[in-house]
């Protein structure tokens, strides 16, 4: 049985990855699961300088999901290279680093800095809805997506993935902009812009007012967008958004995703990624499927 997939030149032992911002740098989850079993770890979003993030509250539970407004809190790219990367190098798992710049120059600076051993891929975050500069402001403009991708590709030999926002009219246009800029793959979707209101105080729950919705509630939207993106580009698509079971993961792959990433479910069930991997294996056995790649893009549409 072959579970190996190739995403933009990066060979993964299986198609199950972690979604950035939901798995930290793997340390905490390493106490619950064997990190070596994962297809890839996508680390928490990094910025050039340390970032405090947004004031609390940062998380708010919703029916079938959650809103978050963390604001990319992190210790910066230098601290990651010095303190976190050595830990990840001890594992036999692909490491993809999510970077979030406020300017095109910042994206290129971090990508160049991360063009080192132990880093297998770069995920360009042009889709975070919880920051005032950069983030989704880039991701809703195809020209910005193209320019950022082009500049990052100039300075790194690593696999370059562009993480797209769902808060656009045509996801295919944005995916094509990333492809035209030289991206090796696209990942989608990031969170959907949402909000919550305290009816007692009549004020927004979040200081930023707008937050990012994730979890099972967004899965049908994510699935539709992955389907559209996979039809719009020739490069691999990594699907995510509300995946909490192997059945969810298979839906994304049948729709055209070469790999999948699990996010919010990690907060609910630390074993979610492993359960999805095992579920896919069982599905393949029951359906006499020898190669996972037979499933990818196998949707039958009349």
UniProtKB/Swiss-Prot annotation:
Any one GO BP annotation for this protein: 'de novo' pyrimidine nucleobase biosynthetic process
CDD domains in alphabetical order: DHOD_1B_like
Cellular compartments per GO CC: cytoplasm
Binding-site list for FMN: 20, 44-45, 98, 125, 163, 189, 215, 241-242, 263-264
Active site positions, chain numbering: 128 (nucleophile)
Organism from which the protein derives: Thermoanaerobacter sp. (strain X514)
Keywords: Cytoplasm, Flavoprotein, FMN, NAD, Oxidoreductase, Pyrimidine biosynthesis
A Pfam family hit: DHO_dh
Reaction catalysed by this enzyme: (S)-dihydroorotate + NAD(+) = orotate + NADH + H(+)
Binding site for substrate: 44, 68-72, 125, 190-191
A GO molecular-function descriptor: dihydroorotate dehydrogenase (NAD+) activity
This enzyme's EC code(s): 1.3.1.14
Note describing how the cofactor binds: Binds 1 FMN per subunit.
InterPro entries assigned: Aldolase_TIM, DHO_dehydrogenase, DHOD_1B, Dihydroorotate_DH_1, Dihydroorotate_DH_1_2, Dihydroorotate_DH_cat, Dihydroorotate_DH_CS, Dihydroorotate_DH_I
Its biological purpose: Catalyzes the conversion of dihydroorotate to orotate with NAD(+) as electron acceptor.
Localization in the cell: Cytoplasm
Protein name: Dihydroorotate dehydrogenase B (NAD(+)), catalytic subunit
Names of required cofactors: FMN
Family: Belongs to the dihydroorotate dehydrogenase family. Type 1 subfamily.
PROSITE patterns, per database record: DHODEHASE_1, DHODEHASE_2
Domain of life: Bacteria
Principal location listed in the UniProt entry: cytoplasm
Keyword Transport: no
Annotated metabolic or biological route of this protein: Pyrimidine metabolism; UMP biosynthesis via de novo pathway; orotate from (S)-dihydroorotate (NAD(+) route): step 1/1
